[in-house]
């Protein structure tokens, strides 16, 4: 059976201001057969950090692998714990979060989602992966 590789990345320099939670539900014949969970918590919500933590990882990209099914649903939660550095909305535009899914070596989903710096985002991505 083919493997799915789920990748989530951003080049946003202030991504340290956000916690990230990812869940992936894999279905076969309409039944959930696997649930993957990933959590990257930098600080508690409301922390209002003044600078990037010294232990912040160089590459905070997400890589998840699982066996393919018929369908994949991704739940991606980008949760701000520290407000944007600029207090004016016009100077804190949305940033890109790239999500891609490969089945074996074939790319079956690629999209750049825009993330609001003030509120973060809750993304739900449904993909037919075909076995």
Regions found by a protein language model. Give the residues of each.
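Exposed aromatic-hydrophobic patches
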Residues: 58-65, 121-130
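Short, surface-exposed binding/anchoring microloops in extracellular/periplasmic proteins
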Residues: 1-34
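Short coil-to-beta strand junction motifs in C2/discoidin
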Residues: 17-22, 89-98
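Surface-exposed loop/edge segments in extracytoplasmic proteins
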Residues: 28-38, 46-51, 105-112
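Mature extracytoplasmic domains of secretory-pathway proteins
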Residues: 39-85
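Short, solvent-exposed aromatic-acidic interface loops
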Residues: 41-43, 111-123
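Short amphipathic, basic-aromatic surface patches that mediate peripheral association
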Residues: 9-12, 79-89
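Extracellular or exported targeting regions of proteins
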Residues: 70-84, 94-96, 100-103, 110-112, ...
């Amino acid at each position: 059976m083919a493997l799915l590789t789920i990748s989530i990345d951003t080049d946003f320099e202030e991504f340290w201001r956000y916690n990230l939670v990812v869940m992936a539900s894999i279905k076969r014949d309409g039944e959930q057969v696997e649930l993957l969970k990933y959590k990257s918590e930098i600080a508690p919500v409301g922390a209002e950090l003044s600078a990037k933590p010294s232990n912040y990882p160089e590459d905070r990209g997400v890589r998840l692998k699982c066996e393919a099914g018929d369908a994949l649903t991704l739940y991606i939660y980008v949760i701000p714990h520290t407000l944007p550095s600029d207090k004016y909305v016009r100077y804190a535009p949305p940033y890109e979060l790239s999500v891609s899914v490969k089945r074996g070596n074939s790319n079956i989903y690629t999209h750049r989602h825009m993330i609001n710096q003030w509120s973060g985002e809750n993304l739900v991505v449904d993909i037919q992966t075909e076995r």
